[in-house]
A protein has these predicted regions:
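Mg2+-dependent phosphoryl-transfer enzymes with acidic/Ser/Thr/Gly-rich catalytic loops
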Residues: 118-193
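Active-site phosphate-binding/coordination module
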Residues: 1-50
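Alpha-helix boundary/N-cap detector
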Residues: 19-23, 84, 88, 168
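Exposed alpha-helical structural elements
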Residues: 23-27, 88, 92, 127, ...
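Conserved acidic, metal-coordinating active-site core of Asp-based
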Residues: 42-139
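General small-molecule cofactor/ligand-binding pocket signal
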Residues: 11, 108, 165
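Hydrophobic, Leu/Ile/Phe/Ala-enriched alpha-helical segments that form helix-helix packing faces
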Residues: 27-43, 89-101, 180-184, 188
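A short acidic, often aromatic-flanked loop/helix-cap motif at beta-alpha or helix-coil junctions
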Residues: 1-6, 18, 114-117, 170-175
Length: 193
């Protein structure tokens, strides 16, 4: 990278190319239909716009909108805990996809307010293909490590090597990273002596 904070893209792929145009359109129509059901259910939640984001390799769907402020996010989180909005719609989305014969698309919880939808096999472990185990000690911190969470597969993959950590938020993430860095610095100083 040329400057701090910049990155080098090492791989790019497309969900639409992987599953095909027709399946991709079916996925999008299903997401839009499910969003309409959430609106029609008249939950006491705000809708802020920007509900869908095509990230190339996946679709991110946020029922309240990706641009929601913190107050709106907290309102949705409370309602989701009480009514299980996202759990219901994960199950409904899966049933609808299976009824259409689409078995190669996955939906998982993403963060506190959204879903991630991607081709089967393209969970976060997909990135490890670009970092051979012999060359990298990949560590992972995630907030959705349970079975329906978008961090689950990578968390489980690295957990047996003590290289994955579940976090409750940004403050704990900083603590986890600080601990990992301090352990690494301790190992380096042992090697130097």
């Amino acid at each position: 990278p040329d400057s701090p904070g910049s990155f080098i893209e090492i791989f790019r792929t497309s969900m639409e190319d992987k599953i095909g145009f027709e399946k991709f359109q079916l996925v999008m129509k299903t997401i839009i239909s499910q969003q309409a059901k959430i609106v029609e259910a008249d939950y006491d939640i705000p809708f802020t716009g920007h509900h869908f984001q095509n990230r190339g390799s996946m679709i991110n769907w946020s029922p309240i909108g990706r641009n929601a402020n913190n107050g709106s996010r907290q309102q949705f989180i409370a309602m989701d805990k009480m009514c299980q909005i996202r759990s219901q719609h994960i199950n409904m989305f899966r049933r609808l996809m299976l009824s259409e014969g689409v078995e190669d698309v996955v939906i998982k919880l993403g963060g506190d307010t959204s879903f991630d939808i991607y081709p089967a096999g393209w969970d976060k472990t997909f990135a490890l293909k670009h970092f051979p185990e012999s060359d990298w000690d990949v560590m992972f911190v995630g907030d959705r490590c349970g079975p329906n969470g978008n961090d689950h597969e990578l968390y489980e993959h690295l957990r047996h090597q003590d290289r994955s950590f579940e976090t409750s938020g940004p403050e704990e993430t900083i603590e986890i990273i600080d601990t990992c860095i301090n352990k690494l610095l301790g190992v380096i100083s042992e090697i130097d002596t």
